[in-house]
Amino acid sequence: RGSFTLSPISLTIQMGEIFAILGRTGSGKTVLLEAISGMFPGDTGSILLDGTDIRDIPPGQRKLGLVYQDYGLFPHMKVKENISYGLKMHGYSKKEQDSRAQELMEMLSISHIGDQYPGTLSGGESQRTALARALALAPQVLLLDEPFSALDPATRQSLYQELRRIHRHFGCTIIFVTHDFLEARTLAGRAAILLDGELQTVTDTARLMDGHFSAEVERFLGRNQIITAPGRKQEKRIVQ
């Protein structure tokens, strides 16, 4: 992605889990997410889905759903047309397209905006529309790039619940990018912490509040260490 380079990364994500890619802005989180999606051809390494390199699978058959940070909705299409677009490209009948779009709009509480255009939507409505479109083809893996960063707190909490419901209903793996470790802890069971293009650690999110990490990760998590005596440290943990 431009001139940004990730250091070699080895990462295993279990099917069916909710997994966070966590780090500061500019640390390479989105680049890693796009690499997982198979967006970059690459000449080294592999990205395996059920044992097959994702880059060897034709894009239309990868069983991936991707939600971009800016939602990526087609401005000239109505909400229901955005949602059914992938179905149309895969040869589904108009009846099947309409039925699936309606099902997803009802599930995500956006039936009332089906005939509206993206330019008229709130941030929460745009995010729900983007989620519905990504789910239309029943992906095995749902990839989300900073899905909650531009939303107000109430909408964010509502979408946390929606994402959990999606996970229960579809049983898909969910991988999302965030800079907020509290958000990662709220939604994900595990997180990869990425700083300056390097994978620092993979940890259970329950440990983000009080686990012991490298100095760089501790700084990212907003913690201070106070030296109290020569050769001895007393840790003062401050969560910002």
Where do the language-model regions lie?
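Helix-to-loop junction immediately C-terminal to a conserved catalytic motif
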Residues: S37
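The feature captures the beta-strand-to-loop junction immediately N-terminal to the Walker
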Residues: L22-R24
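A short, proline-enriched helix->beta-strand linker immediately N-terminal to the Walker B motif
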Residues: A136-Q140
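Conserved ABC ATPase "signature" C-loop
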Residues: D196-G197
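Conserved ABC ATPase "signature" region
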Residues: K88, K95-I113, R164-R165
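Conserved ABC ATPase signature
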Residues: Y117-L121, E125-Q127
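Catalytic Walker B motif of ABC-type/P-loop ATPase nucleotide-binding domains
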Residues: L142-E146
